């Protein structure tokens, strides 16, 4: 017996959320003192310049944005991320998007969250919103310790399909 279900695909940033979750996460880490503001802003400005010129290497950019993870366990990051979810993400959830998500659930449709956001943030948000299917940029781990690298390909454009 074949069951045909409709698939509803949602983006995360400025759709389900009223913010850019990766940028909000980095701002949060800077404001809490986990990342040095001056160092981050200087390096980020260089990436933004390359982006405007059309020369940005997204893998390098993502790995720059997750360097703070390197050599840390998910348990360590989990406590920090939990506070971030309460303080930043919960108030940023778009109530209209949430209603739409629930309408799809009520129709027994499959839902997919497809985002360029890193797994460190997209995963917990997907869990909070009860998405079973998630495509995001995956932060690499070895023995439950973050390496500071991402798995190829980044979840942008065609990378969301691979």
What are the functions of these language-model segments?
Residues 1-53:
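Active-site neighborhood of HAD-like aspartate-dependent phosphohydrolases
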Residues 2-5, 79, 86-162:
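C-terminal cap/substrate-recognition subdomain and adjoining C-terminal extension
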Residues 20, 72, 159:
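Conserved active-site and cofactor/substrate-binding residues in soluble primary-metabolism enzymes
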Residues 22-24, 28, 33, 74, ...:
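Active-site phosphate-binding/coordination module
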Residues 60-96:
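Metal-dependent phosphoesterase signature
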């Amino acid at each position: 017996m074949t069951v045909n279900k409709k698939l509803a695909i949602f983006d995360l940033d400025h759709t389900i959320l009223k913010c850019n979750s990766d940028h909000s996460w980095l701002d949060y880490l800077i404001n809490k003192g986990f990342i040095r503001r001056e160092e981050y802003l200087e390096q980020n400005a260089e990436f933004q310049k390359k982006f405007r010129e059309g020369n940005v290497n997204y893998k390098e950019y993502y790995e720059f944005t997750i360097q703070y993870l390197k050599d840390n366990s998910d348990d360590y990051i989990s406590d920090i991320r939990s506070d971030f979810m309460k303080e930043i993400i919960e108030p940023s959830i778009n109530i209209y998007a949430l209603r739409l998500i629930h309408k799809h659930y009520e129709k027994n449709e499959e839902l997919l969250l497809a985002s360029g956001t890193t797994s460190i943030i997209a995963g917990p948000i997907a869990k909070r919103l009860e998405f079973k299917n998630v495509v995001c940029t995956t932060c690499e781990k070895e023995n439950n310790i973050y390496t500071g690298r991402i798995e190829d390909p980044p979840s942008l454009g065609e990378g969301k399909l691979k």
